[in-house]
């Protein structure tokens, strides 16, 4: 699984619209800015909600939690979303 596919999996996990039973990523305009440093891997996501409200979502992954994770993506299993549930800290602001 590529890094892009992994990002999409995370987006689907956190933008899931429970009321409509659909994935909000298909209804939102998403802009992704990726910043990588020696210890942190950050995703800054700006999206437009269906109702045209702006949301800013910040995901931060502690790279030390994924020792060898990005160097060997073949180690991923179908449960890669669980890794994001454990490793992501997220906040929403209107």
Swiss-Prot record:
GO aspect biological process, one term: protein glycosylation
Cell compartment(s), UniProt: Endoplasmic reticulum membrane
Pathway of action: Protein modification; protein glycosylation
Record keywords, A-Z: Endoplasmic reticulum, Membrane, Transmembrane, Transmembrane helix
Segments passing through the bilayer: 24-45, 53-70
Membrane topology: Multi-pass membrane protein
GO cellular component, one term: oligosaccharyltransferase complex
Keyword Transmembrane helix: yes
Tagged with keyword Transmembrane helix: yes
Role description: Subunit of the oligosaccharyl transferase (OST) complex that catalyzes the initial transfer of a defined glycan (Glc(3)Man(9)GlcNAc(2) in eukaryotes) from the lipid carrier dolichol-pyrophosphate to an asparagine residue within an Asn-X-Ser/Thr consensus motif in nascent polypeptide chains, the first step in protein N-glycosylation. N-glycosylation occurs cotranslationally and the complex associates with the Sec61 complex at the channel-forming translocon complex that mediates protein translocation across the endoplasmic reticulum (ER). All subunits are required for a maximal enzyme activity.
Assembly and interaction partners: Component of the oligosaccharyltransferase (OST) complex.
Entry's family note: Belongs to the OST5 family.
Protein name: Dolichyl-diphosphooligosaccharide--protein glycosyltransferase subunit ost5
Organism: Schizosaccharomyces pombe (strain 972 / ATCC 24843)
